[in-house]
């Protein structure tokens, strides 16, 4: 990946709705060059899709939390089955398989703390593979809008 690819990615990460011509104009390159670079980035799997950023509160998701799970027995099939179950729940946005004291972290959102409590009790306490979990309510979050490539 060269500097031109990195510049294209920066612009697309800030606003994926930009036209090819607008990106080319900003970078001072021909639109055909820009289009070919974007196609190549997609073909190489660098660009995996274009997404819309949504305010969770606008979807009645006022409370967000990270649920830290301990799973047993710890096997690929059990982890995969639980991951499939969790990601199928409408309250779940992301499932992470992690190392350390927890086996999985699940990012959820809910209309209220009461709803969150009921969701946890109804969806996870009866699952045999869940030997324990703890909840961290998210007060605020920030993320980088642009992820630049890192050098080794």
What do these predicted ranges mean?
Residues 1-152:
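A compositional/biophysical signature of low hydrophobicity enriched in polar/charged and small residues
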């Amino acid at each position: 990946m060269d500097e031109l690819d990195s510049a294209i990615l920066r612009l697309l990460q800030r606003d994926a709705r930009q036209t090819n011509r607008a990106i080319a104009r900003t970078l001072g390159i021909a639109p055909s060059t820009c289009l070919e670079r974007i196609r190549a980035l997609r073909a190489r799997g660098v660009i995996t899709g274009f997404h819309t950023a949504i305010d969770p509160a606008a979807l009645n998701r006022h409370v967000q939390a990270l649920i830290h799970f301990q799973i047993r027995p710890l096997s690929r099939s059990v982890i995969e089955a639980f991951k499939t179950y969790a990601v199928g729940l409408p309250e779940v946005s992301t499932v992470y398989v992690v190392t350390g004291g927890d086996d999985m972290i699940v990012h959820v959102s809910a209309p209220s703390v009461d709803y969150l409590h009921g969701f946890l009790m109804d969806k996870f306490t009866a699952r045999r593979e869940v030997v324990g979990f703890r909840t961290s309510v998210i007060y605020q979050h920030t993320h980088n809008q642009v992820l630049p490539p890192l050098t080794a």
